[in-house]
Design a protein with these regions (language model features):
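Histidine-centered, metal-coordinating catalytic motifs and their short helical/loop contexts
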Residues: 70-94
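Amphipathic alpha-helical interface segments
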Residues: 1-72, 101-138
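Aromatic- and Lys/Arg-enriched surface recognition patch
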Residues: 91-105
Length: 138
């Protein structure tokens, strides 16, 4: 279910990004969040947080069967941790007294680096040509 849902969300994301009117809409973030949430669930199945007993056996068997290599992007905890710790980032933004929040799709990293500054919290940014999702310092 999570793999299929991640694939559907990713297809929707690509469609929205190719549409000039939708590219900066909230819909992009809805489907990106859906994709990341489902990908995080797949990651947890493949690489449990506390791999003990049945969880460890399941993760090992699934990674072997699906030929998921060590270092695969799906095993990274960065994206799933990012989703799960939004409350901590909001607390940091408030404490720093930030005056703006950056939430945008950029065609490339140069555009992002041009507009990003210390007084803006990076809520969520997508760098389209790399398909890289950035939130705060991640």
């Amino acid at each position: 279910m999570h793999v299929s849902s991640a694939l559907v969300s990713y297809s929707q994301l690509l469609r929205l990004l190719s549409d000039g009117k939708e590219r900066q809409s909230r819909n992009v973030w809805f489907v990106l969040l859906s994709f990341l949430t489902h990908a995080a669930m797949v990651s947890k199945l493949l690489d449990p947080i506390r791999p003990e007993g049945a969880k460890e056996d399941r993760g090992t068997a699934l990674r072997k069967h699906l030929e998921v290599e060590v270092g695969s992007a799906i095993l990274s905890r960065a994206a799933r941790d990012n989703l799960e710790h939004i409350d901590e980032r909001i607390d940091r933004w408030t404490k720093r007294g930030l005056t703006s929040v950056l939430e945008m799709v950029f065609e490339d990293r140069a555009g992002f680096e041009f507009i990003a500054h210390e007084d803006a919290a990076i809520r969520r940014v997508l760098i389209q040509d790399e398909m890289i999702f950035i939130s705060e310092d991640r």
